[in-house]
Amino acid sequence: MDKKQFGRYLLAASLYFTVSVLTPAKPATMYLPLFIIERSINANVVHYDAKLSDDGNLDPQEPVVAYWIMAAKDGHRQELNLLERAKAYGFTVHADASGRFYHMELVSQRRRDIHVYRDGDIVRAETLIDGQPAYLQKVFVSARHLVVIPTPDYVEMFGVDVKTGAPRSEKVRPGR
C-alpha cells in the first residue's frame, strides 16, 4: 500500500468513525410485563407485555404484545399462532377517547374490559376481579383435553386490589 492509498484509507476510517460516533443510536424498543396466563395442561405460559414507544409512553400502533414462553420445553419465546390468537389468547386493544389508557379485551373473555396504562415507571392492566378494581397479574386456566382441543373447566383471575393492595381472585366457569 503506497502513501496515497494509506491516506485514503485513513480518511475513510476516520469519516466512518466520526459518523458512527455522532449518529445517535435508535433506542431499543422497551417492553414491560402486564400479566400472564398459566394453564393446567403444561408449563408453557402466555405473556402479555406493554410495548413502549421512544418517548416512554405506550406505543399507539401496538400497545400490547402477547407471546409464549415455552417452559415445558427449553424456555424459548414463541409467537402465538393464528388459531391461538383467534380463539384463546388473542386480544383487541384500542385507545380510550380520553387518551389516558387503552381498552383491552381477551378473545376468551370478551365481556371483561381491561384498562392498560402507564403508572410512573410501571404499566398496569386494571380490571374488575370479584367486583372490585384490581391490577391483573395472572390468569390460570384449568382445562382438560377432549380429543385434540383443550376445553376449559374454569378460569381463575389473580391480582391486587387497587385501593387496599390486598390480593384478589375470582373463579369463572365457562358460559357463566
Cite the ranges covered by each PLM segment.
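Mature extracytoplasmic domains of secretory-pathway proteins
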Residues: 64-135
